[in-house]
């Protein structure tokens, strides 16, 4: 979604109206969350977590300190290599969601291939003792209508974002103050914020 001044909600390009038809969303657009001055102020913190480099636990610590919850879209690598973190996410009230097992472009896959990929991640989390929430985020944000329909057929809702902070490149990060200012400048009621616990 494009940045919208005045902290109003952005709107997706009309070509992507099928997102909603496929059970997907990128913003909380319920009436109480559509106005910048609405009574309810809400943002959703979502994290694409593929691997651990020492920051996932720090993010969990910060969320605990702030008494905040998030949704973690995890990959098979994190679930298999760090089952303790998957268990901690669930134990501390966060959603453990499906980001696929191997983080590959799924846009042209068959429905059976998609179902197998979702199940593979579910199984990895289940081995860690955690059931995944029925929310999916496509790897790299790449999607097609056929992918979203296949995901919906497996009982999932696809979660996109209304603001994605470019934090995946560890070598190109601004100062904490500049990062905070950028995020606050782009906040809007009902925002779904995409973050990565790698930087």
Could you tell me what each predicted segment is?
Residues 1-46, 51-61, 65, 178:
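N-terminal pre-catalytic segment of deacetylase/amide-hydrolase enzymes
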